[in-house]
Amino acid sequence: MPIKTQGDLPVKEILERENIFVMDEKRAMHQDIRPIHILILNLMPLKEETELQLLRSLSNTPLQVDVTFMAVESHEAKNTSLSHLNKFYETFTDIKKSKFDGMIITGAPVEQMPFEEVDYWNELTEIMDWTEKHVTSTIFLCWAAQASLYHFYGLEKKPLDKKMFGLFQHRVLNRKIPLVRGFDDVFLAPHSRHTEVPIADIHACKDLTVLAESEEAGLFLAMAEGGRKNLCYGTSGNTTA
């Protein structure tokens, strides 16, 4: 089913060449389908690459998806033009009164910094708190998963002796959870990071349910509040990790 974006979003041409059905707002108005509204907080420096990766993944759903991109206001982007951000991105101020069916918060290349030293940390924590009343289900990817573990549950990340990088074998722990429906019992997924929250700390948190993990790489997927919060620790959505 189609992805709805602004008509002249640059990555639209690439998606169409890949036979992904993308439509603009004008055409969407004539579709007698209630779309699901997804907000994407894009924290990655190369925003257009991340847009493409996430829209490819969202195109696999049978539902019509209405995507809104958001960027933080408290950080000056150096790798994406201001004109692109002004044209295709909303800010928290713009959307804070809205509600969304789902939200994706991407990773960011700041994992070796203390959370409080990230220049947009205060804004991000406000956004994370806002999701609890304005978003039905949120998925936190990579560094954002670490940020959510720290902010909501007080779990600290720890530096690794050497960078974790590569494909690792994982196993599904609870097949009854819809989020892992369609997963193989054992599957490969990539990780690329310098820090981790120990898997034992996550298992020990009564508010979290681990859905998939690796003996070598630790957490891959966890959830809280019956799926209102979902944490994906690998880099399976990225082609440029």
Placement of each model-derived feature along the sequence:
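Conserved phosphate-coordination/catalytic loops
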Residues: S83-N86, V118-N122, H191
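Short, Asp-centered acidic motifs that coordinate Mg2+ and/or phosphate
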Residues: G102
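Amide-donor transfer/coupling interface in amidating biosynthetic enzymes
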Residues: M1-S74, I95, K99, E126, ...
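Short active-site-adjacent helix-start/loop capping segments
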Residues: E49, E76-N79, E111-P114
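Cysteine-nucleophile active-site neighborhood
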Residues: I105-N174
